Each structure stands twice: as structure tokens, then as C-alpha cells.
Design a protein with these regions (language model features):
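Bacterial Sec-dependent N-terminal signal peptides
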Residues: 1-21
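An acidic-aromatic substrate-binding cleft motif
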Residues: 266-359, 367, 371
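Catalytic domains of carbohydrate-active enzymes, especially glycoside hydrolases
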Residues: 356-377, 444-448
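Catalytic cores of secreted or luminal carbohydrate-active enzymes
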Residues: 567-614
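Carbohydrate-binding surface patches
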Residues: 617-655, 702-705
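C-terminal beta-strand-rich structural cap/linker in extracellular carbohydrate-active enzymes
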Residues: 683-710
Length: 710
């Protein structure tokens, strides 16, 4: 169903000193725009009468360019403006995502587009505001015009003036990685806590003592939840935020390229949306579709080949350190196309062997999993990292002990597919050189999804993971994959901004610390009750949950441990939404706890409806989801190191139906550090209106399945 209503009102007017307003459909969110001083564009935002963003400046700064006709005195797009036109409109539709947390999404907003003109030189930009019941988006637009055709953005100066010294859940600003632990502090404390927030990880490099990444979640002292992010980041660098901590004003901070410039533009063009989500209920932050709604509709006519995936794989044992991606220890350096692996002595630790992959295929087939990821199948892993090497992989040639043809045939005979792995070692140029042949190889053997990786320093050298060049590369990989009906799960790529609506074969991203960090010292217990408020605002995460043997030293030489209980791992299949979900542990570990593994067998990966029952950033999240095309529900609850008691009223169940309810929860003595594998399974019948009360241990959680009784 689609309902569209448009009402346009164009007003020619002189320079305004009074504010122009646009309100959300329900009137709760009010955005006011005005020009101040010497034609400086500003805006402010309120929610239910409370200030959210105080008067904040808008504008951009260009780089002088003789070729583009931009003189040094013409680089200012921050003042000297007059309002030349204002248009307001309303829009309402219901659209259906290819996959998602719900089967339909309401897109309802009021809009105001303000045309701003500078007389000398004569040029116009448009600032467009879209205001929703749960927030707003704004962007800059550059119409086709003679005095602003080609131009280079030196800096973007979009401000977000906070109304107080809010509590924030933040990551240090970084051009190349989001793999930090979240810091919780007042905004005024960011500067003092920045140094401790950075580890000696060589991939972590901050740009400012008060610079942070988006999505940034905050909470005001009077109970407002506020989130700053961006939507539809296309052909533009990723935005960070730099804080003036004397005045509590954030300003946009764009990722530079190798020359220090930010974005190369050709009109007509738009920037990404700068987004604000706001509510006095934390649950609204998690259920918001504002980011998705600000993206363009799906660009594909046929999406029948795009399917959510539940998978296992040859991965965790390498992450823990018990097996390796590389095939041999004989070659300190590899030259693709020259080095002969057929005569090399195997190191005995290689994970991606034909025999091992068959074992995982058998496990997947037995337990109803769709695919098996295999990392380390292709030549080149012996010297893949740290050398700024251009030609690292060819994405086509398997190691001698990996029979790509036989394994795919074996998998297909079992009703399972293999999931391809393309680690690029951040050599994007090399990947693009081989991409077409790599995708053709996948088509030849029946792969329909690929996990890509970008570990290391970017090639082209000097570029950053989150600059305009690489953002274009990531999207190019997705759109080229679509031509081959391939789904993409990109790791180490830029953080998502809702592009999965437009390109739904972008089925997963990493872009944060995932489960792998549990083998590198561990994630804090509150990690997975923060990420849904921050990282997941832009799109789903391939978090790779499901670790049952949480004490790694019990089965490997790794001394780290997973900072959740076993039941808490089950919760992640609901709390950490993704249409791509991994059963990440080893098959033999699941066999030891087959009764608990039943929840992973049963849980869906695509949904008709989702209900966030209770939530507080960094403390707890409880969510219920209805499996796509069924009457069955699943509930997940996760908490931090303090534990939690979830109270769940089953008022979302269908009237008149009885449900077989299975509760997988922490045992009374469970504790993520002292007794992580203590869990309880309770079965009973429930109906609409019943109440479940479930105790969550420190670092714990639970999963609940609700099947309609037949």
C-alpha cells in the first residue's frame, strides 16, 4: 500500500530574520531555520517543547581550484546568503523491505527546502529538512548552475549545539576503524577520557582530543534520548563529530583523502543526510526507521535471489589461534601467479581443508543451517598483512588441500551452500582488478554470498577506509555483485548509513567490535546493549554470536574468555538484529549442549514484526520478534554486568491461540565470569496477556521461542 500526499507552497521572499518552521506530522518535533548576522544559515530543533539542538550554524568551505573556477575569495559557503525560495511539502507512504525487522515500514514526514543564494558570486545551494515523528534529517543540495559546477569540499561546517552536558556513549573519532570499546561519559569528560579509550592497536588513530564517531547516542538529564548519525552516504566521505567542549557544540568532521581534501563534487549533487533521532522513550530509538526512510527505494527490479542466511563456518578456530588461514610456513613471501604451492609442505594447521569443510557441511545440513563460511581457502595468506602489498590475492586460486569443485557439489547435495570469503588486505585497487572474475567464479560453483574484508592500510596508498574513494569502492562492490546475484557482507568497511534499503544485497556489515574480540581480550558485558543504540542505527551487523564454550583456555591456548553467559549468547540472535546470523562456535561444542543449541536451530532470521519491550542504553534490551510468514514469536533479552529482571507481558500474541513456550535462561547461579555455562530450559504453554518474568545473570540473557500449538 502506498499513500502519497503532496502540498507545495513556493514563496519568494527577502532576507529573513524570523524563523521558518517545519513540524513533524504529530507536532512533537519542531525544526526552525533562520539567517543571522551576515546571512549565516542556522537551525534549531525542539522535541515536545524541550530544546534538543540549540541554534546551530550550517555551511561548507570549498578548496580554491583554478580548473573549477573557484577563486580563493569564493570558497565560503557559510555566510552572505539570502533566502530566494522556500518550499514545503508532506509525504506519506508504506513500503516493504526485502528483509528487515518488520514486513512494512511507514515513511511519513513534513519537509522544508530553503534555497539560499549568494550574490557574489551568483550561486545557490538548498538546505532540505525532513521532519519525522522521531527526529529529522537535513542535507545540502547543489543545483546545476554555471558558477558551481565542479567543486571540491575542503570542510563541512554543520553544527549540532547540544542543550546540555549529556551522558554519551561514544567511540574515538578515527578515519579507519570503529573497533573500539564504547566509552560512557558526560560530553565534558570526552577530552579527559580520550587517551585511555585508545589501545596500542596500530590501526587506531584519533584525529582530535574531542572527536567522536557516529552513530552517537546521548541521554539528557531530563530524560531525552538523542542520536546523531548520517543517512545515505553516497559518493561522499564518512562524517565524524568534533566537540567544542566549552560550548557543547558538535561540528561535522569529514574523512580526508590522501591530499587532505574531503569530497570532489559535480552538480547537481547532494550530501548525505545529517540525522537526529529523539524521544523520551529509549525503545523508540531502537524501533526508529528514520535512517532507512531517508535512503532511496530499492534499485533492483528483481530481489527474489536475496535471502536472509543462517550459517556456520571455518573461522572461530582460526580467530582463537588453534588453526591458521595459511597453508604453509615455507614461503616468507608469496608472488601470486609465480609461487608454486603444489610442492610446498603443509603446516598442519591450515583450517580450510576439504575434510574440515565437509565436516562443517554435514553439521549445517543436520541442523538446518543455510551456508558454511570458509576463510583461508585461497592462496596468499602467508604474507597477507602488514606489507602494503598491492597484489595480495587473486580470489580464484585455491590451496592444494581445498577442492572447490567437489566441496560445492557436496554442499549442494546436502541442501547447503558455501559462503565465499574475499579478504582484500585493504588493497581495493587489486580487488577491483579481479572482482569480475571472482564473481564469475562464484557463479560457476554456486556461491550466492560473499564476506569481504579490508584489514590493513588502504591501497590506493594514503587513502582512508572512510574517505570518498573507499566509500565509492564499497558501493561498487555491492552493485557489481548484484549483477551476479550475489549478496555482500562487508567487514572493515565504513559504518552503514541505511544503504541496505537501496541495495538490499548488502546483507551485512561488521563496522564495530564483533565476537572476534572475545578472543583478543574480550568485549565489555554492556557492549551488546550499547551497539543497537549506536552502530546498528545505520544497518545490521554480522556480529557472529553463538559461542557456547566461553572459556577459551578450556579447549585452546587462548587465555581470553567471552564476556557473556551461554544464555546471553542466545539472546544476541534477537537483540543484535541481522538477516545474516552465524552459529560461530565449533560443531563439537554445540553437540555438547544440543538442548541449548535447539534455540539457534529454531530462531528465525527474517521478521514480520518486532516489539521492543524494555530498553536502556548500556543496561538492558528485551525485544520480541515475529518470524516472517508465521504466527511464531521469539524473544531475546540481554543485560550488562549488573544483571536484570525482565518482565514481559505477552500482549502481542494472537488472541485465542495457545503457544508452546520454551525459555532458555541463565540458571540461578550463572555468572559470565564464574559460571557462564549454567543455563535452564523451561517449557510451558502461554497465551496472550500472560506475563513472563526472567532473571538475567551478570553478563547474561535469555532466548524464548513461542510456537503456536497445533
Amino acid at each position: 500500500m502506498k499513500i502519497i500526499s503532496l502540498c507545495l507552497c513556493a514563496l519568494m521572499m527577502p532576507l529573513l530574520l524570523v524563523a521558518q518552521q517545519v513540524k513533524s506530522p504529530n507536532g512533537n518535533v519542531v525544526v526552525s531555520f533562520s539567517l543571522v548576522d551576515n546571512g549565516v544559515p542556522t537551525y534549531k530543533v525542539s522535541y515536545k517543547g524541550k530544546p534538543v539542538i540549540k541554534q546551530s550554524r550550517l555551511g561548507l568551505e570549498l578548496t580554491p581550484s583554478q580548473n573549477d573556477g573557484i577563486k580563493a575569495e569564493d570558497t565560503n559557503l557559510m555566510n552572505g546568503f539570502k533566502v530566494s525560495n522556500t518550499e514545503t511539502s508532506s509525504f506519506k507512504e508504506v513500503w516493504k523491505p526485502v528483509w528487515g525487522e518488520t514486513s512494512s515500514i511507514l515513511n511519513h514526514y513534513n519537509e522544508m527546502a530553503v534555497s539560499l543564494t549568494q550574490e557574489h558570486p551568483n550561486r545557490t545551494i538548498i538546505v532540505r529538512f525532513r521532519v519525522y515523528n522521531d527526529g529529522m534529517g537535513l542535507r545540502y543540495e547543489f543545483p546545476r548552475q554555471s558558477n558551481l559546477g565542479y567543486f571540491i569540499i575542503k570542510d563541512e561546517h554543520t553544527q549540532f549545539a547540544m542543550a546540555g552536558d549529556h551522558t554519551a556513549w561514544w567511540l574515538p573519532g578515527d578515519y579507519d576503524t570503529q573497533e573500539y570499546e564504547t566509552v560512557t561519559s558526560k560530553l565534558s569528560e570526552i577530552r579527559s577520557k580520550m587517551k585511555a579509550a585508545v589501545t596500542d592497536n596500530t590501526s587506531q588513530t584519533t584525529f582530535s582530543e574531542t572527536g567522536v564517531q557516529t552513530s552517537l547516542q546521548m541521554k539528557s538529564s531530563d530524560g531525552l534520548y538523542i542520536n546523531l548519525h548520517e543517512a545515505a552516504c553516497v559518493n561522499y566521505p564518512t562524517m565524524h563529530l568534533n566537540l567544542d567542549d566549552k560550548n557543547m557544540v558538535f561540528e561535522s568532521w569529514l574523512t580526508p583523502d590522501a591530499q587532505g581534501n574531503k569530497a570532489y563534487m559535480q552538480a547537481p549533487r547532494t550530501t548525505p543526510w545529517r540525522t537526529l533521532i529523539v524521544s523520551d522513550d529509549a525503545r523508540d530509538m531502537l524501533s526508529s526507521n528514520l535512517i532507512l526512510n531517508l535512503n532511496e527505494p530499492c534499485q533492483y527490479d528483481d530481489t527474489s535471489w536475496i535471502k536472509p542466511v543462517k550459517y556456520c563456518g571455518v573461522w572461530w578456530e582460526m580467530i582463537v589461534g588453534r588453526k591458521s588461514w595459511s597453508y604453509t610456513d615455507e614461503f616468507p613471501a608469496v608472488e601470486i601467479g609465480v609461487t608454486d604451492f603444489s610442492k610446498a609442505k603443509p603446516n598442519g594447521r591450515h583450517g580450510a581443508t576439504t575434510a574440515e569443510v565437509k565436516r562443517y557441511i554435514d553439521f549445517a545440513a543436520k541442523n538446518g543451517l543455510d551456508q558454511v563460511l570458509v576463510e583461508g581457502w585461497n592462496i596468499g595468506w602467508e604474507d597477507w598483512f602488514g606489507h602494503s602489498k598491492f597484489k595480495v590475492f587473486d580470489f580464484q586460486t585455491p590451496y592444494p588441500d581445498f577442492d572447490i569443485k567437489a566441496l560445492n557439489e557436496y554442499a549442494h547435495s546436502k541442501g547447503v551452500k558455501l559462503l565465499m570469503h574475499h579478504e582484500t588486505s585493504a588493497s581495493a585497487m587489486n580487488y577491483e582488478r579481479y572482482m569480475e572474475d571472482a564473481y564469475k567464479l562464484m557463479n560457476k560453483y554456486g556461491y550466492n554470498s560473499v564476506k569481504s574484508g579490508y584489514v590493513g592500510n588502504i591501497i590506493p596508498r594514503g587513502e582512508h577506509h572512510y574517505g570518498q574513494v573507499m566509500n565509492n569502492h564499497y558501493l561498487y562492490a555491492v552493485t557489481e555483485a548484484a549483477k551476479h546475484k550475489i549478496m555482500v557482507n562487508a567487514h572493515e568497511a565504513t559504518r552503514p548509513t541505511g544503504l541496505c534499503r537501496t541495495y538490499p544485497n548488502l546483507i551485512g556489515n561488521e563496522s564495530a567490535r564483533g565476537t572476534e574480540y572475545e578472543a583478543f581480550g574480550g568485549n565489555n558485558p554492556d557492549h551488546t546493549v550499547i551497539l543497537p543504540f549506536t552502530r546498528l542505527q545505520g544497518g545490521p551487523m554480522d556480529y557472529t554470536p553463538g559461542i557456547f564454550e566461553t572459556q577459551l583456555k578450556n579447549w585452546s591456548s587462548n587465555q581470553s574468555y567471552v564476556h557473556t553467559t551461554l544464555a546471553g549468547q542466545l539472546a544476541l540472535y534477537l537483540v543484535m538484529y541481522s538477516p545474516l546470523q552465524m552459529a560461530a562456535d565449533l560443531p563439537e561444542h554445540y553437540e555438547k549442549y544440543s538442548d541449548a543449541f535447539q534455540f539457534i536451530r529454531d530462531v528465525a532470521v527474517d521478521w514480520d514484526d518486532s516489539k521492543y519491550i524494555e530498553a536502556e542504553p548500556g543496561d538492558y534490551i528485551t525485544v520480541a520478534r515475529k518470524a516472517k510468514g508465521t504466527d511464531n514469536w521469539f524473544i531475546g533479552g540481554k543485560c550488562d554486568e549488573n544483571g536484570h529482571k525482565a518482565v514481559i507481558k505477552l500482549d502481542f500474541l494472537d488472541k485465542g491461540k495457545t503457544y508452546e513456550c520454551t525459555i532458555y535462561s541463565d540458571a540461578a547461579d550463572a555468572d559470565y565470569e564464574k559460571n557462564p555455562k549454567a543455563y535452564s530450559i523451561i517449557r510451558k504453554q502461554v497465551k496472550r496477556g500472560d506475563v513472563l518474568k526472567i532473571n538475567e545473570a551478570r553478563g547474561g540473557g535469555f532466548g524464548v521461542s513461542l510456537f503456536v500449538k497445533k
